[in-house]
Amino acid sequence: MNNIVLGIVQAVVITAVAPFFSGLGRVITAKMHNRRGPSIFQDYRDIAKLMARPESQSEDASFALRIMPPLFFAVSFMLAMGLPIFTQESPIPVFGDAITIMYSLALSRFFFALCGVDSSNAYAGVGGIRELLMSVLIEPAMLLALFAAALVCGSTDIATMGQMIASGSVDAPVAVILAGIAFCIACYMELGKLPFDQAEAEQELQEGPLAELSGPSLAIAKLAMSMKQVVVIAWFCAIFIPWGEPATLGVAAVIGALVFLVKCLIDFVIVGIISNSVSRSRFKNLGNQTWAVVGIALLAFVFVVVGV
């Protein structure tokens, strides 16, 4: 029972802080562009305004447009409940398995892309197709990096992998480092930041698959996207940067929560700086960049076999 409560608390905290971290990215962008920019809490205001506005949808749209925002939010909330964020143990282990997380993210991405294609908007349709292409290019690299780390740790459970890496009880540390590098790059691609912001390229597609959403649906979708970014970063930290998490509940869990928030703050600052230091990649060059990540993950497999 305590674990279920902890999982719910984790998900609620991530839901509460997700707009703050997305607002932090906007502030970093403004500062690097020598602009005043919005407040770091602007995303909270945007979500509140959208929730109060009426909703309008295309007459030609099917259930996919209506079901995507709550489904996207539910998947992000579920994953936040399962990851070992505040402690070393996963509150709900069935949600904290690497395979479960991959399939859950694929489900939300599929409906996110389907929402754009189904909306009868040309820009949203192109954005949805690009979102699916990004999925095809990113997921193999993610899977290979995860499986390389899972082979070394002997488990696909995120908590077990993090505990073994934190204790240094892995037989192939070089393989773990290479898998961590590949997974880190794949997670950055998953965040949809430059130079990999293809599905929502503002200059080209006008917010991509979200073009036909409005009102509460758009608010929920934007909140879910912010939550997903925090979940992806928490996923990476839980496996490859697991230090600082307590082993038990109680007061130590509060310290673990603070450590997690500090990790997220540092990661989002780094992501914001990188995103604003590069230009958007050409759509046709994405395959070459993602194959480099796959190559690093395959090299990690080689070191797993060698045992280095």
Regions found by a protein language model. Give the residues of each.
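Juxtamembrane boundary at the C-terminal end of a transmembrane helix
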Residues: 299-308
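Membrane-interface amphipathic/juxtamembrane segments adjacent to transmembrane helices
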Residues: 25-54
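Mid-bilayer segments of alpha-helical transmembrane spans in multi-pass integral membrane proteins
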Residues: 81, 100-115, 136-149, 153
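Transmembrane alpha-helix boundary signature
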Residues: 58, 77-92, 112-121, 155-156, ...
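Alpha-helical transmembrane segments
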Residues: 6-17, 93-106, 168-190, 253-256
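Interfacial loop-to-transmembrane junctions
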Residues: 270-297
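Juxtamembrane/interfacial segments at transmembrane-helix boundaries in multi-pass membrane proteins
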Residues: 91, 149-176
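Cytosolic juxtamembrane amphipathic/interface segments immediately preceding
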Residues: 46-64, 122-126, 209, 213-217
